[in-house]
Design a protein with these regions (language model features):
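Amphipathic repeat-derived elements
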Residues: 1-13, 28-30, 93, 141, ...
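Core catalytic region of metal-dependent phosphoesterases/phosphodiesterases
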Residues: 2-95
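Catalytic phosphate/metal-binding cores of nucleic-acid and nucleotide-processing enzymes, i.e., regions
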Residues: 3, 21, 140, 178-182, ...
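Alpha-helical architecture
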Residues: 6, 70-72, 102, 124, ...
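Long, contiguous hydrophobic alpha-helical segments, chiefly transmembrane helices and signal peptides
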Residues: 9, 51, 102-105, 147
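Generic structural signal for conserved hydrophobic packing positions in ordered secondary structure
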Residues: 59, 93, 102-104, 145
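Conserved beta-sheet core of the metallophosphoesterase superfamily
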Residues: 84, 88, 99, 106-179
Length: 187
């Protein structure tokens, strides 16, 4: 499966359009959104092109191609206007033989780990900072950064997961990091 992974749109129609243009170029089987879809939250400035109703109108027609987890800014009210589920705290996926625990990052993160076996992957957004680091027993922590409000001078970005591994890209599609799926250290 070819999976596109993005996080933290925070209601930006401007960056949602760019993400969906990247989706059109990439042609993934699914788009995994790691939370904070419509609301910007009290700690963030309004993102460029803040228009949650436009984001709703862009995402609802794609409901069959979307997988989502709940972010700390996502609420039951958001779920009422979206035609796809967004309120799960996490999703379990697979990248080759490795389990991927996908979550937003405000509950489960490297400081508060979910149950992970040797070689499993923790994937979350929330920080708005792209990340790829090994920890524990061959585990990986991965973060796509933010499509709309990147922090620490990072790019507006997303990730791709293919059979060969992960690639971090800016919204124009330029690759700035790759990580091969090497399971020699996996369970």
């Amino acid at each position: 499966m070819k999976l596109m992974i993005a996080s933290d749109l925070h209601g930006s129609a401007f960056y949602c359009r760019q993400l969906l243009a990247a989706m059109e170029r990439e042609q993934p089987d699914k788009l995994l959104l790691l939370g904070d879809i419509l609301y910007h939250g009290p700690r963030n400035d309004l993102p460029e092109g803040y228009a949650p109703k436009e984001v709703i109108a862009m995402l609802n027609p794609l409901r069959e191609r979307l997988l989502c987890v709940r972010g700390n800014c996502d609420t039951e009210v958001d779920q009422m206007v979206l035609d796809f589920p967004i309120l799960a705290d996490y999703a379990l996926l697979y990248a080759g033989s490795r389990a991927v625990f996908a979550t937003h990052g405000h509950h489960y993160n490297t400081a508060c780990l979910p149950p992970l076996a040797k070689g499993d992957i923790l994937l979350h957004g929330h920080t708005h900072v792209p990340a790829w680091q090994e920890f524990g027993s061959g585990n990986l922590y991965l973060n796509p950064g933010s499509a709309a409000i990147p922090k620490e001078n990072s790019a507006h970005s997303y990730m791709m997961l293919t059979d060969s591994g992960f690639a971090w890209k800016d919204l124009e599609g330029s690759i700035y990091h790759t990580l091969a799926l090497d399971c020699s250290n996996c369970g």
